[in-house]
Amino acid sequence: MGKRYFCDYCDRSFQDNLHNRKKHLNGLQHLKAKKLWYDMFRDAAAILLDEQNKRPCRKFLLTGQCDFGSNCRFSHMSERDLQELSVQVEEERRAREWPLDVAELPEVCLEDWLEKRAKRLSSAPSSRAEPVRATVFQYPVGWPPVQELPPSLRAPPPGGWPLQPSVQWG
């Protein structure tokens, strides 16, 4: 048996030769599947532009369904759908322009913010009457004893890991 060609758009395979591949790639099922795939990645502005240029589909308006589906030459969107889509396009446009508005804000220095924070914390009365206790590390329930755990799952020593002098990595 010869090599087989698998089409990702159609999710099917066939014998790979020039005639079969050309016939498949120009076939209606393949073209529909390919269009459907690329339509998933279209932005709202392109969809809105296409839908505004189409006339409403009479069959879809009367029966609620159309035999042509997404390949119909006419629009299946109602006026309300078009308005919602235009609002979405406007929000996306504003979101793209937002970084331009951020550039106009005054530049704040980290040191200034830290100084203000330190002043605020020192002038505010302490709301805690008791000292802060260190949290005690506990292993999850159902884990094996600590001696059986690999080093990566064991708790760090109380003072932290000791630094190894002149250790080279890699």
UniProtKB/Swiss-Prot annotation:
Cellular component terms per the entry's GO annotation: U12-type spliceosomal complex
PROSITE patterns: ZF_C3H1
Keywords in alphabetical order: Metal-binding, mRNA processing, mRNA splicing, Nucleus, Spliceosome, Zinc, Zinc-finger
Disulfide links within the chain: none
Coiled-coil ranges from the UniProt annotation: none
InterPro entries linked to this entry: U1-CZ_Znf_C2H2 (IPR013085), Znf_C2H2_sf (IPR036236), Znf_CCCH (IPR000571), Znf_CCCH_sf (IPR036855)
GO BP of this protein: mRNA processing; RNA splicing
Segments forming C3H1-type zinc fingers: 51-79
Localization of this protein: Nucleus
Gene Ontology molecular functions: zinc ion binding
SMART domains the record matches: ZnF_C3H1 (SM00356)
Region (Disordered): 150-170
Gene3D superfamilies xref list: Classic Zinc Finger, Zinc finger, CCCH-type
Highest taxon in the source lineage: Eukaryota
Pfam family, one: zf-CCCH
Complex formation: Component of the U11/U12 snRNPs that are part of the U12-type spliceosome.
Protein name as it appears in the record: Zinc finger matrin-type protein 5
Provenance organism: Bos taurus
